[in-house]
A protein has these predicted regions:
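GST-like domain detector, emphasizing the conserved glutathione-binding G-site
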Residues: 1-130, 151
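Short, flexible loop/turn segments with low-complexity composition
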Residues: 201-203
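GST-like fold's C-terminal all-alpha helical module
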Residues: 99-194
Length: 203
C-alpha cells in the first residue's frame, strides 16, 4: 500500500493509526506548494485533488482520512481502535468528533482569519478569529471533563480519538495556539502519548 501525503493533521492521524495497528504503508510525499495534486497523473488517481489518499496493491484508491482509517481497521482487527462494542464505538466517536469538529475545525477557522497566507483567498476577520479561538477553549474544557483514561483518552488502549487529538494539538502548536496548557488531564495525556513509538516514528 502507498499513501500520498503532506505534513498536515489528517495525514498525521492516519500515520499514527497505522503504526499503532502495525500496518506497513509506503508514504509518498506530495508537493502541494508546486501544485502536484493538480497534475493529470494525480487527478487521475484522486479527482478531489486532496491528501491523504491510499493506493492499494491492485490500484484501488481510498480517499479521505476517515475512510482510510476504516479500511485499515477492517484489514487488521487487532489492536481494536474503533471500538469493540456499540457503547465503546459510541464513546470513541464522541471524543474523536469533539477533537475534529470542536477543536480542529475551530483552529482552521482561526488560522484562515489571521494568517497572511490566506489573505488573498477570501475576506478575513479578527472578530471571527477570536470567536473561533473562544470556541476552541470552550471545547477544550469539555474534552478535559471527558477524559477517563490514564495513558489514553478512554479505555486501556489507543483509539482513533488519541490519533485525532494528537494531530490536532500538533497543528495547534504549529500555528502558535497553546491554550491546552491550562488543562491538567489533557496535558498529562498529551505528554504520555507523545512519547509513544508511533509519534517518534511519525516525526
Amino acid at each position: 500500500m502507498k499513501m500520498y501525503d503532506y505534513p498536515a493533521p489528517n495525514a498525521q492521524k492516519v500515520k499514527i493509526f497505522a503504526y499503532e495497528k502495525e500496518i506497513s504503508i509506503e508514504y509518498i510525499p506530495v508537493d502541494l506548494i508546486n501544485h502536484e495534486l493538480r497534475t493529470p497523473e494525480m487527478l487521475n488517481k484522486n479527482p478531489m485533488g486532496t491528501v491523504p489518499f491510499l493506493e492499494l496493491e491492485d490500484g484501488e484508491i481510498i480517499r479521505e482520512s476517515r475512510a482510510i482509517i476504516e479500511y485499515l481497521e477492517g484489514i487488521k482487527e487487532s489492536p481494536n481502535m474503533l471500538g469493540k462494542s456499540p457503547l465503546e464505538k459510541a464513546r470513541i466517536q464522541e471524543i474523536d468528533r469533539l477533537a475534529e469538529l470542536g477543536l480542529m475545525i475551530e483552529l482552521a477557522h482561526y488560522v484562515h482569519n489571521i494568517s497572511p497566507f490566506f489573505a488573498d483567498k477570501g475576506p478575513q476577520s479578527k472578530e471571527a478569529a477570536e470567536m473561533a479561538l473562544n470556541c476552541y477553549k470552550k471545547n477544550l474544557q469539555i474534552l478535559e471533563d471527558s477524559i477517563t483514561g490514564d495513558e489514553f483518552l478512554i479505555f486501556d488502549r489507543p483509539t482513533v480519538a488519541d490519533c485525532t487529538l494528537f494531530s490536532t494539538f500538533t497543528f495547534a502548536e504549529s500555528i502558535g495556539v497553546e491554550d491546552q496548557n491550562g488543562f491538567s488531564k489533557t496535558m498529562a495525556w498529551y505528554k504520555k502519548f507523545g512519547n509513544r513509538k508511533s509519534i517518534e516514528t511519525e516525526k
